[in-house]
């Protein structure tokens, strides 16, 4: 059986932490920022984690991560 391939788009967007969780960046921070408050923009700089329900899907996309 051939090797499985990682989904390259997902591989660029997620990193695995030491505990095995998947770390991600927040969305909605690239443009149309004038109407967003400084507090909102500051919170968008922080990272987030993939939810438990989505982790199973991500394991299929990233078998070697």
Swiss-Prot record:
Keywords: Ribonucleoprotein, Ribosomal protein. HAMAP family: Ribosomal_bL35 (MF_00514). Belongs to the bacterial ribosomal protein bL35 family. The keyword Ribosomal protein applies. This is Large ribosomal subunit protein bL35. SUPFAM superfamilies: L35p-like (SSF143034). Residues 1-25 are annotated as: Disordered. It comes from the Bacteria. Pfam families: Ribosomal_L35p (PF01632). One of its GO terms (molecular function) is structural constituent of ribosome. The keyword Transit peptide does not apply. One of its GO terms (cellular component) is cytosolic large ribosomal subunit. GO terms for biological process: translation. InterPro entries: Ribosomal_bL35, Ribosomal_bL35-like, Ribosomal_bL35_CS, Ribosomal_bL35_sf.
């Amino acid at each position: 059986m051939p090797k499985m391939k990682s989904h390259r788009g997902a591989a660029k967007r997620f990193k695995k932490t030491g505990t095995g969780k998947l770390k991600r960046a927040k969305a909605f921070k690239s443009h149309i920022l004038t109407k967003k408050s400084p507090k909102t923009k500051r919170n968008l700089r922080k990272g987030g984690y993939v939810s438990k329900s989505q982790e199973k899907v991500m394991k299929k996309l990233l078998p070697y991560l």
